[in-house]
């Protein structure tokens, strides 16, 4: 009897029993499985007792499948208390459905199952390889429920739901950027400075479709809210950063909540996220000044005497504020700037118990007495021209700079919620003094607006018209107030709430101001899209004399590390997630950045394709002198501009290496324009 049972089991391992239907023929090539009552046979590939509904995935063995790559060979069997194990070969009879209602939720499921376990410990079906280059979320129906593996590492683009839902968003093609970071809604090419219209909306929408089709959710195999422990945290930093990578990703292709999601596998196939944290601020060469713009995430200190909590916008408890204060001081201490522009700090004046004085006190306690002081905008209890709960402020090191004249607050009532604040400084660290004006800005947010300020569905969010008006007023403030006060060189930094190619930045460009970072220099993540709301914009006479970098300590980190979410688990001595915006660091060298960065390794750019004589380094030496001042645009082959520089060929040659260091290796397009001169050249970055 035992012998006959064993022989039958061996036969069953290789022969489908009569009456069984291939899963591929049930799934078909359409958008949904064919409803009906079926009997299937296959191998249990994944068991998920935490999903709602609970159940397991079954996949046809290769020898028994329908052989059509356009059809999925797997589906989900709903069973409240699964009685199977991974590797079991099962025969299941039940009703197949795929619709929007429970328990399907638009995933092919088999319900009311009658299950027979034929054998256990069987080899699992091979992984179907998904090529990153051709991956499209719009074409995953053919893999529904199957074991899949990606051919190359995927990049984390969003960690917003990690704590609450145990899921992260991954992209098959690196970071996903806001469309308006590269594509101007009005201008094509994006080098234009038009700030109204919708002539180029189609390009932005097409770019977003590409973004949407390159991402997939990595789930945790559970429908439970607030999973403990939080999945996918790395062992070193206990975080999952946007920009982190997952190599050799394997899982089961599921669907739920309107999105394709990879359900994880156990053991050696479990996903591992690799993170790289910038533990130190970006390095600079010799500098005459270091400036910082930092959004301090509603820094409210209560009544300044330990009470007054919860605050209007910031910390709810004294313990929350202590954590917030410690993290912000840790970040500012490490950046060690000569001048700092602050946004989102409580607008309660400059008194002994004010938030501004409290932050200065904390910095001086950490760095030494009198290290920092604040510029006095004249508002003892509230900033002039500002009725908002928060304001812009400036602190500085008296040992590095001296104030030149009074602090200037933009005198434009009704235009700004938080008016720009400017201060002229004289350097103390040079044989002869240089002057510089520093302006801090915080434009209207994208979150709300009505009428003309409603979201126009052009990628710029709500209140864009308000921000346009603020950009125009900032230009007037610079030209009519700041420069006449004695400024020759101006750095205007802060939270503009506008990405690189949006209208407010175009308005600044149209006046001759220059954003001093390329589009992929990001500072903020929203809904899985990386962008830059924070900028350093300079007068054209500072091009070649500033080096602007961002310290990515905040936007890439999950929100649950913030002071008021993680609670006691927060590392209060860490600068990471001290805010939701990354700080902008501006290095100034009045002798020129080529001197300041002389020790930095050069980026190698080669003419592409290789000339017949062999590889040739790209150089501007051949540009005729008659071309005069050049404009150089560095672009992706698909069209989006990554950076634009202006200057003499010699100056551009010295800047090009520095400004392209951060770009990934690959093929790019250079466009040069000058007096009666125009050249387009493809280059390969090593």
State each model region's role.
Residues 62, 398-399, 429, 511, ...:
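Solvent-exposed strand-loop boundary residues in beta-sheet-rich modules
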Residues 44, 96, 154, 253, ...:
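Hydrophobic beta-strand positions in extracellular immunoglobulin-like domains
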Residues 19-315, 319-330, 364-366, 374, ...:
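Extended non-catalytic accessory segments flanking core domains
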Residues 81-82, 168, 172-176, 225-229, ...:
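Divalent cation-coordinating acidic motifs and surrounding scaffolds
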Residues 2-8:
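Sec-dependent signal peptide recognition
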Residues 14-15:
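N-terminal signal peptide c-region/cleavage motif recognized by signal peptidases
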Residues 33, 85, 143, 211, ...:
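Surface-exposed coil/turn segments at beta-strand junctions on protein surfaces, enriched
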Residues 598-686:
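C-terminal outer-membrane/trafficking sorting elements
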């Amino acid at each position: 009897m035992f012998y006959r049972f064993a022989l039958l089991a061996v036969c069953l391992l290789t022969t489908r029993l009569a009456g069984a239907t291939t899963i591929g023929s049930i799934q078909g090539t359409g958008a949904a499985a064919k409803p009906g009552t079926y009997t299937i046979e296959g191998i249990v590939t994944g068991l998920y007792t935490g999903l709602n509904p609970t159940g397991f995935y079954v996949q046809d063995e290769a020898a028994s499948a329908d052989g059509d790559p356009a059809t999925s060979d797997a589906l989900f069997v709903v069973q409240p208390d699964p009685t199977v194990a991974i590797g079991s070969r099962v025969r299941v009879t039940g009703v197949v459905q795929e619709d929007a209602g429970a328990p399907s939720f638009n995933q092919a499921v088999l319900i009311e199952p009658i299950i027979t376990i034929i054998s256990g410990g069987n080899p699992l079906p091979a992984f179907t390889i998904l090529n990153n280059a051709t991956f499209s979320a719009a074409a995953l129906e053919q893999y529904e429920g199957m074991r899949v593996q990606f051919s190359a590492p995927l990049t984390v683009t969003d960690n917003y739901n990690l704590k609450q839902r145990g899921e992260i968003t991954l992209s098959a093609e690196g970071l996903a950027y806001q469309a308006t970071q590269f594509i101007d809604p009005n201008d094509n090419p994006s080098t234009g400075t038009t700030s109204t219209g919708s002539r180029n909306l189609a390009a932005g929408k097409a770019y977003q479709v590409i973004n949407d089709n390159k991402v997939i959710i990595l789930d945790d195999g559970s429908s439970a809210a607030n999973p403990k422990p939080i999945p996918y945290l790395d062992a070193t930093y206990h975080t999952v950063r946007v920009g982190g990578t997952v190599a050799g990703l394997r899982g089961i292709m599921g669907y739920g909540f309107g999105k394709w999601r990879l359900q994880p596998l156990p053991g050696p196939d479990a996903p591992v996220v690799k993170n790289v944290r910038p533990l130190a601020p970006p390095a600079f060469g010799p500098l005459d000044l270091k400036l910082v713009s930092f959004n301090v995430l509603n820094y409210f200190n209560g009544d300044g005497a330990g009470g007054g909590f919860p605050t209007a916008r910031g910390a709810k408890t004294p313990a929350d504020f202590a954590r917030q204060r410690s993290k912000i001081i840790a970040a500012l201490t490490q950046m060690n700037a000569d001048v700092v522009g602050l946004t989102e700090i409580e607008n309660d004046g400059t008194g002994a118990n004010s938030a501004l004085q409290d932050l200065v006190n904390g910095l001086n306690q950490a760095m030494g007495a009198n290290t920092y002081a604040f510029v006095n905008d004249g508002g003892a209890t509230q900033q002039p021209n500002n009725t908002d709960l928060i304001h812009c402020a400036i602190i500085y090191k008296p040992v590095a700079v001296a104030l030149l004249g009074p602090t200037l607050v933009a005198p434009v009532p009704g235009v700004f919620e938080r008016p720009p604040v400017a201060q002229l400084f004289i350097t103390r660290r040079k044989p002869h003094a240089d002057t510089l004006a520093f302006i801090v800005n915080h434009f209207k947010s994208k979150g709300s607006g009505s009428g003309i300020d409603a979201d126009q569905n052009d990628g710029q969010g709500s209140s864009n018209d308000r921000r346009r008006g603020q950009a125009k007023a900032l230009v007037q403030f610079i030209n009519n107030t700041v420069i006449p006060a004695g400024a020759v060189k101006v750095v205007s930094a802060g939270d503009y709430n506008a990405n690189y190619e949006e209208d407010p930045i175009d308005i600044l460009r149209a006046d001759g101001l220059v954003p001093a970072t390329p589009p992929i220099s990001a500072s903020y993540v929203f809904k899985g899209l990386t962008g830059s709301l924070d900028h350093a914009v300079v007068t054209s006479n500072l091009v070649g004399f500033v080096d602007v970098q961002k310290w990515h300590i905040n936007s890439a980190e999950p929100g649950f590390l913030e002071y008021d979410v993680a609670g006691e688990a927060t590392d209060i001595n860490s600068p990471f997630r001290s805010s939701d915006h990354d700080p902008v660091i501006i290095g100034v060298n009045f002798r020129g950045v080529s001197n300041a960065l002389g020790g930095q390794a050069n980026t190698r750019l080669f003419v592409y394709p290789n000339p017949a004589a062999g590889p040739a380094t790209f150089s501007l030496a051949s540009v005729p002198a008659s071309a005069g001042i050049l404009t150089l645009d560095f672009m992706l082959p698909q069209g989006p501009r990554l950076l634009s520089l202006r200057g003499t060929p010699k100056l551009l040659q010295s800047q090009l290496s520095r400004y392209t260091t951060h770009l990934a290796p690959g093929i790019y397009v250079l466009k040069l324009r000058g007096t009666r001169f125009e050249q387009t050249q493809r280059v390969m970055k090593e």
